[in-house]
């Protein structure tokens, strides 16, 4: 399992709403159909989100990043973005699962 976390800080609430809508309607469906296991978007503040994407392996993560390269560059022009990623080394599971 490989995970990628992206933090996005927009300059305004409306800009963040546009980015979030684009992720929901375009990027996430395409990425999931291309092999991404799951994707979640979390609100940190009215102008900040972070996304958590899971992949089977780094190769799949890089393939999907390649699909988004131009879009990411365009989004990054108007806001701040940071990226954390790596392979899972520990998995915890709830006793209720």
Model regions and ranges:
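Short S/T/G/P-rich N-terminal loop/turn motif that feeds into the first structured element of a domain
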Residues: 1-50, 55-70, 77, 81-97
